[in-house]
Design a protein with these regions (language model features):
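N-terminal amphipathic alpha-helix/helix-capping segment at the start of soluble metabolic enzymes
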Residues: 1-23
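Hydrophobic faces of well-ordered beta-strands that scaffold small-molecule active sites
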Residues: 22-24, 52-54, 114-117, 134-136, ...
Length: 171
């Protein structure tokens, strides 16, 4: 099997002979504060990142208090001190879709790529023209209908494999 060598994300060539593509994974570390999100974009650029990446999800579509409470260890060590439920925390700290235009403009101003990890196809609404690549989280590696839809968008896909096994990655 042969593979095409290299591709571009914006103006940056991604290839084995090139410098690594540095993604600042801001995710939800803005703590639900758009000003903090903007500050993190500028900090990412100052740190030498090529890209500022966020996560776009809606809490009610990826977490459930019922699901977490049914686990033997419903409060993992880092969640034991939370005063709110897992679903409430996710809802509070998600990247709000109404922030998209501001985040995209801030990335342009900082001269850094904007990227996201969408957790549903609707997350791409309104930002498809502003991303030059899409990152898929490893938890979605076996979510075939989602991957097929994303692959039809015509953008390079960075597919995480951390929460998968070898069979997941080759099928």
């Amino acid at each position: 099997m042969t593979y095409k060598s290299g591709f571009h994300i914006g103006s940056k060539k991604i290839d084995i002979a090139e410098k690594p593509y540095f993604i600042a994974d801001i995710a939800a570390n803005h703590d639900g504060d758009i000003e903090r999100a903007k500050d993190l974009i500028y900090l990412a650029k100052t740190s030498g990142a090529d890209c500022a990446k966020f996560q776009h999800f809606k809490a009610d579509s990826i977490v459930s208090d019922v699901g977490f409470s049914s686990l033997d260890n419903s409060k993992m060590s880092h969640q034991a001190s939370w005063k709110k439920s897992v679903a409430e925390i996710y809802d509070q700290y998600h990247t709000k879709r109404e922030w998209n235009d501001v985040l995209i403009e801030t990335c342009k101003d900082a001269d850094i790529e904007f990227m996201t990890t969408p957790y549903d196809i609707d997350a791409m609404d309104g930002i498809l023209d502003s991303v030059n690549a899409i990152k898929i989280g490893s938890g979605d590696i076996t979510y075939t209908p989602f991957l097929k839809k994303i692959s039809k968008l015509g953008k390079p896909i960075l597919l995480a494999t951390g929460a998968s096994n070898i069979e997941d990655t080759i099928t």
